[in-house]
Amino acid sequence: MLNELFNECETKMKSSVNHMLRDFKTLRTGKVTTSVLDNVKIDYYGTLTALDQVGSILVADATTIIINPWEKNLLNIIDSAISKANIGATPNNDGSQIKLFFPAMTVEQRQESVKQMKGMGEHAKVAVRNDRKNANDKIKKSEKDKEITADESKSAQDNIQKITDKYISEIDSILKTKEAEILKV
């Protein structure tokens, strides 16, 4: 029973870290990535479709993304969808491809990105701590219902704390690495 609880708790904590990493993809760092286009969709024959489903997307350099649609009639549709998405880039449609030029990030923008990232990290830590609380509540209930002894309860709570410390430490490590990446000019 306790092993199942430990595994469940660890799975939930790992999920919180993965959710934070997915959220980080929306942050702008010093280098542009194709993930800035993940939420841009176009009307493709009546269906909302992601850009990577209608053409190739590649990063040309630290501030430029090139979109080559497989159907040239989509150029204007893609251009307008990007403009409406307000992703901070200027689309340049040359008739065969679209180039997105992102301005270099200012120090203030970098600091704002770090601030957002730390908020996401704190949110993940709160989720991990909530998972710990839920697991400890289940352990205490099992002890109260006489399913486990007081010693087993204490040992199980210590184990849950070790798992929590592992994931909090992992979040801190990821935050430190990401902060250095964002602030690097």
From Swiss-Prot:
Gene3D superfamilies: 3.30.1360.40, Ribosome-recycling factor (1.10.132.20). GO terms for cellular component: cytosol. Keywords: Cytoplasm, Protein biosynthesis. Residues 131-155 have a biased composition (Basic and acidic residues). Signal peptide: none annotated. It is found in: Cytoplasm. Residues 131-156 are annotated as: Disordered. One of its GO terms (biological process) is cytoplasmic translational termination. One of its GO terms (molecular function) is ribosomal large subunit binding. Responsible for the release of ribosomes from messenger RNA at the termination of protein biosynthesis. May increase the efficiency of translation by recycling ribosomes from one round of translation to another. Belongs to the RRF family. PANTHER family: MITOCHONDRIAL RIBOSOME RECYCLING FACTOR PSEUDO 1, RIBOSOME RECYCLING FACTOR. This is Ribosome-recycling factor. It comes from Sulfurimonas denitrificans (strain ATCC 33889 / DSM 1251) (Thiomicrospira denitrificans (strain ATCC 33889 / DSM 1251)). The gene is frr.
